[in-house]
Amino acid sequence: MHDIRAIRETPELYEKAWAAKGSPGKVAEILKLDEALRAAQTALQAAQAERNEASKKIGQAKAQKDEAEATRLMAHVETLKKALEEQGEVERSAGEALRALLAGLPNIPAAEVPDGADEHDNVEVRRWGEPRAIAAPKDHATLGEAMGLMDFEAAARMSGARFVVLKGQLARLERALGQFMLDLQTQEHGYTEVNPPLLVNDAAAYGTDKLPKFAEDLFQTTDGRWLIPTAEVPLTSLVMGQIVAEEELPLRYTALTPCFRSEAGASGRDTRGMIRQHQFNKVELVSITTPEQSADEHERMVGCAEAVLKRLELPFRTMLLCRGDMGFGARKTYDLEVWLPSQEKYREISSCSNTGDFQARRMDARAKKAGEKGTRYVHTLNGSGLAVGRTLVAVLENYQDEGGRIAIPEALRPYMPGMTHIGGAA
């Protein structure tokens, strides 16, 4: 959600940002609705003042035993009550229209975010690691199916497309990855582990900017609740409607959960393998900060996500997204892209975003400093630390040998005692 006062004061900034996102002319529409709302509020306040004054005079007339005047004033108050109801409806209608328009408009990028239309305009910040020399690398699906440990056909029979069944050593490797990530983020990076609900209500989905714009990308139950597309939703919602002590910030939460996405806009993209699934596991990172802390916390979060790839010795690059490629709620976003030998390119494995106070305004999450009056909105940040399925894909492809065996990364061997490879002798 946006601060209407900021839009009034710097309309050009908002118009430029929204036009770049394909929503030109919205500022004029917002200011028109804002003017109508303020006019309705002024008229309502005037009518309330007139009613209060008339009610006061009724008492005075009765005290003076002027029944005729009292009767006239009472009739006038009744007329004002009807006018107040009508004016109140005008105010509600204008307010709802303004809120609905603001709710559908994306966040404003930070000043340092580069201009650009799409992923081709993103800026590479750094690279880590060198891709291994692998002769004729196989893709992860071919490797998994050859071992008999990755079954897309069985998944399709029971669930349809974009699902997978992992078995045996591969299921164990996937579990080890998730546990390793969670241990790293909690034991070394100071995140508090949370086991959150996988179903959330409209308020939680709205507060984390998934509703109303992205309803078609979510799965909804028959009772109206939503399966989480990411643990960002319940983790950030821990502060929904709350006032937290500034002295306790930053708050850092992490969770390993299944995530559910309809992939409504992904027709024809990544149809083979595990890159784009309706259900997948992910370790999520969420931070709640003061406005002054959020920029540094963002850089820290990116480092926490990068640490997973470094420990696994997977080559990757870190990209600063341009304005046109950022998500709806993001003020600034870094993507981590891991090297996939079969595709001979880097693919997204994590996205770390600073939303500023965009989500906090939607969910009314505030902070208060001890000894001071008033509150202010917190800043919220979220990132993948990492997507477990895509990390499994990267491990399979980067650690394959010519015989189709997969070496287990050193960082994962404590989670798989006695094993050094998958697909052959231990």
UniProtKB/Swiss-Prot annotation:
Cysteine disulfide links: none
UniProt binding sites for L-serine: 230-232, 284, 384
Enzyme kind, highest EC tier: ligase
Subcellular location: Cytoplasm
Complexes and interactors: Homodimer. The tRNA molecule binds across the dimer.
PANTHER family: SERINE--TRNA LIGASE, SERYL-TRNA SYNTHETASE
Name under which the protein is recorded: Serine--tRNA ligase
Originating organism: Phenylobacterium zucineum (strain HLK1)
